Amino acid sequence: DDGIQGRRAHFHNTYCTICTVTPDEAYGLGMNFAKKLNCATAPVSFFIPMRGWSAYDIEKPDIKKGWAGPGAGPSWIPSEKNPRWSFRAERFTEGFLGNLKKDNQNIQVYQVDLHINDPDFNELMYCDLRDMLKGKWHKGKYEAGNKIKRIF
């Protein structure tokens, strides 16, 4: 369905219509997030879920992540480089890394091969925040595994 300004829209119910950002807007969001994080004076971990950003931005049905199908979520756009990844996540990452100051030692960025609604993605962020609050945070702690890649 046509949504606002040509966006894909999913009419969830009478009261809720889901419209997602375009890939170009995702790039702009990445730029803006980077500019804000460039000022960080305390530890910052930034996790980018590469397999989708919402229940409707998903490659295939998964009721536990919020999309029962049929088929891919209504706002899913696969990456040409890696079809299992969201094109929006890829564009966000490009805008983000292109504007992030590489000399700020307080920032670490992870590209995570998981969906935002994946319990493992949420556990990763929880553990990182817990470590920050307990004073046990250090850069690169969560690089283990094939789903997580520290890109900065």
Model-derived features: positions:
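Redox- and metal-dependent alpha/beta enzyme cores, enriched for Fe-S-associated oxidoreductases
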Residues: 1-14, 57-61
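Metallocofactor- and cofactor-centric catalytic cores in central/energy metabolism, strongly enriched
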Residues: 16-152
